[in-house]
Amino acid sequence: MHKHQHCCKCPECYEVTRLAALRRLEPPGYGDWQVPDPYGPSGGNGASSGYGGYSSQTLPSQAGATPTPRTKAKLIPTGRDVGPVPPKPVPGKSTPKLNGSGPGWWPECTCTNRDWYEQASPAPLLVNPEALEPSLSVNGSDGMFKYEEIVLERGNSGLGFSIAGGIDNPHVPDDPGIFITKIIPGGAAAMDGRLGVNDCVLRVNEVDVSEVVHSRAVEALKEAGPVVRLVVRRRQPPPETIMEVNLLKGPKGLGFSIAGGIGNQHIPGDNSIYITKIIEGGAAQKDGRLQIGDRLLAVNNTNLQDVRHEEAVASLKNTSDMVYLKVAKPGSIHLNDMYAPPDYASTFTALADNHISHNSSLGYLGAVESKVTYPAPPQVPPTRYSPIPRHMLAEEDFTREPRKIILHKGSTGLGFNIVGGEDGEGIFVSFILAGGPADLSGELRRGDRILSVNGVNLRNATHEQAAAALKRAGQSVTIVAQYRPEEYSRFESKIHDLREQMMNSSMSSGSGSLRTSEKRSLYVRALFDYDRTRDSCLPSQGLSFSYGDILHVINASDDEWWQARLVTPHGESEQIGVIPSKKRVEKKERARLKTVKFHARTGMIESNRDFPGLSDDYYGAKNLKGVTSNTSDSESSSKGQEDAILSYEPVTRQEIHYARPVIILGPMKDRVNDDLISEFPHKFGSCVPHTTRPRRDNEVDGQDYHFVVSREQMEKDIQDNKFIEAGQFNDNLYGTSIQSVRAVAERGKHCILDVSGNAIKRLQQAQLYPIAIFIKPKSIEALMEMNRRQTYEQANKIFDKAMKLEQEFGEYFTAIVQGDSLEEIYNKIKQIIEDQSGHYIWVPSPEKL
């Protein structure tokens, strides 16, 4: 039982302190307390100075224990410290006034017994805890909290995090706080690096969101402006325990799996090497001291801190039978703590592991650790807590009851994918798009079973019925979902089985990742985006790339996986990674998609097998476009043809002695073309078109137009493919000839061409390889923002036209450009042209993949 410490020995003060600690009351109104303003000198009462007024929910206590009152707190003047929460005033009692002067504050009692003041209990942690003495405990065994102020600058995609919780829908039992549920990769929060999942947001700028409804917190974040100041509360992780372990290798090697390292972080922002799996029957399990979540510091005399994944693998492989390990074990957290994660080891196991084995014939599978988790038999007794930081878990303690979720469609649809619908097995959420409506709401989860959409019962629906219901749902969609991870695991296990089969076949050669016999090397251009972090089946460290990137495939002998490195304008990258083979890309997509139809509204793909708008894997939307013939009507040209999956295009390096023509396609192309010629008249020019129209008096032949003597001659030249594009206006023919383009190119100028996508291939056939750049609008709203005179209908038409353009000619683009302003787009285009203006270029190769 805790001892109730108080500021003096008088009975009145003791009673106030005791009751403040024991009673759980509603939070006081602003102004009840005078608290130092965490953002500067106090200019008024508590309503505008600081974030006082939190109930005991802010610092939850262990069930059944009597919390220690917070009667003294020492404030170290750091300029941005947020003071601890004062005790709740007790009705009917004289309330101690908080003294805000001097370096600290304390309950000011009415007696003269100040001699006991220095014995009062310490305060909880404050902002900038590095300025304080360590190990300041909160409520005894309840753990420790840290308060931090974080200033974020709103980026192109917002603040880059998702929230959940509030008085109306608590994220944590008995806590109405607003919690961070996801940090979106590449967003403002991720780039800043300080905000973390499970942080509790207490204040947004000057708005107190500690106890508000969810919508109020969302509103505060939306209205916060370009620079947002957050005050957050988080658990202080218990200090690590350093342990030395000697392991004797057994038949299964060391018996554990690892993940992490520089360039392959297991936890964002952390280069450490983590133990992710204890193999049943292995040396580590028999020894009993290593656990999932332990951090490897050293192997024998080799330091494993801040090393690459491959270096850690090599250090573990190159050991004798007796191995010395130095590990850091996370501190223990009490089992009854409502904020703590469930027992990870008794509930989950990770998939794409790195099995350490001393058997040289088996090699080493240095896989990227998968973030996907699957149920597995318990590895430790359920009463034993596995001290994994909460952000390392794929599943939290989450309600299994049906939940009502309201989503509003955005430019990416609803932002999630579904699987299932066969033999009445149910419809499940399989993927949440980062930054999409589902992700930003924080309410829908992977593994949720969709029970209904806008009142339409989907409990026994087929996949097609569910996809149709979601497609017809309108802008505001009400979903009833139920978290069923056990049922969803059957779909995950299919991926797992596929990966295991692939790895077993790969091991037969002893290479550890790919079959190395008959190595085949080639260069390819990527026709889709690939994100290695979303591929749970990788047999080794993957290599991410974007559409248009040149890849040197150094080993294409394996049917499923290739080894490759990126080729940049400055040479080849040293990093080698695994990418999916052409066969794997095409097989995976054809198996998943019965038909592929371009979704012009969202710029994504639509299928009768998956929810429209998203891809359920690591492939970008670009690889799903159907290849069509050179015609402006992409839909009619693709009818009756089997859609081809765009994966890789074989290329070869070629030396050229001309300035490549430039074709800009998409919105704002005319403005970009004009600006290029105006700003760089010595680098860019235009060619002289041909026409059968009679010459006017003020026109010069060869300068204004090439005036063709007869229509028959021009028609013949068009039939002989001497023109890249031609058309008719007022019974006169107009066109751009290959020779006109070549004349500009051979003078050392980039010929700016205002033509359609059909001209790209015709120029390639004429050995004039253009720099073809597509300006891809981010959304209809983005178009309207860049041209405020446009109506929604006009912007919508432009957006649809751009999406159809990408569908039809995407495989011929040199690069795709996006931006939030014309200036940003223009600068990117200039850089691309500069990068592509060398004497050596990559051109399509006749080689077959």
From Swiss-Prot:
Disulfide cysteine pairs (residue numbers): none
Record-annotated SH3 domain positions: 519-589
Gene Ontology CC terms, in alphabetical order: AMPA glutamate receptor complex; bicellular tight junction; cell-cell junction; cytoplasm; glutamatergic synapse; neuromuscular junction; neuron projection; plasma membrane
Keywords: Phosphoprotein, Repeat, SH3 domain
Superkingdom of origin: Eukaryota
Gene Ontology BP annotations: chemical synaptic transmission; establishment of planar polarity; establishment or maintenance of epithelial cell apical/basal polarity; regulation of postsynaptic membrane neurotransmitter receptor levels
MF terms (GO), sorted A to Z: kinase binding; phosphatase binding; ubiquitin protein ligase binding
Region of interest (Disordered), residue spans: 32-101
Family per similarity comment: Belongs to the MAGUK family.
Role this protein plays: Required for learning most likely through its role in synaptic plasticity following NMDA receptor signaling.
Assembly notes: Interacts through its PDZ domains with NETO1, GRIN2B, SYNGAP1 and APC. Interacts through its first two PDZ domains with ERBB4. Interacts through its third PDZ domain with NLGN1, and probably with NLGN2 and NLGN3. Interacts through its guanylate kinase-like domain with DLGAP1, DLGAP2, DLGAP3 and DLGAP4. Interacts with FRMPD4 (via C-terminus). Interacts with LRFN1, LRFN2 and LRFN4. Interacts with FLTP. Interacts with GPR85. Interacts with DGKI (via PDZ-binding motif).
Name under which the protein is recorded: Disks large homolog 3
